[in-house]
């Protein structure tokens, strides 16, 4: 007797679970920009309708803020639906960082635009070729203030850069762990935060001891600015010197090179780009000072190229005096003040460009 056995049922195949994808789609490259434009246009229409209905002015600040909020909401929701939660969070954070950057740029762009728009009225050849001697009302220029700014700042740099650089070399190369180095660092940190007027009073008191009260000299202004520059040069140069790898120093010592020559030939060339940037930052910090120069260098309407004889005027002081001592017509004085401010900004920009060029030329070459 043959017994037929039914075949065993085959096991039900277990469905293979696919790993979840990080993103289920991707927004087109133009989509974020389209959402930004739509947010700006739609909120602008709403604010315009509100302004017309309420007979009020257009709220520019509110429009920009609401546009940013609407954009963040839209880009997060749409990205979450199309690309997934991870990408949506990434786009949300990117939007916040971008908006923060734009907000930080608003004051800079506003200041630059205001100075350029108002300073071009007197940005002419007469402004750069004449002084204010015997000038009342319209006309005149700021050639005496431009030369005063350059000479006083140059003298301050000549005084402060060697002192600051040598101090930073001592702190990094010779004073590591010493008590005197800690004391110098503490004093430098304190000097970094002193008000500029204190530096002016110090320079005035120093020269008044030898030349009597009431003295005003260009070199006094240079001393005051040097006091403000030294701590900035020290701190920036110190940080750059500490970034030089110790392996470079040890390799030089292994070849029998003395310490001072290692500093000159290895350490300083390696850090020259950062040191130059720090020096230019210190110059940019002091070139616009007004209070210490009012006390030390004073102000004058004539051109004076001698730092050790007579008063000198700088562009910040020229701007202050023109704005505060307006005559008839007042527009002429205000225009000269704006032109001086624009000239000062251009000088700072040129100095920074020169610093970048110097840093690029003298930076250590990489590669073979």
Residue ranges and their predicted role:
Residues 293-345:
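Interhelical loop and adjacent transmembrane-helix boundary motif
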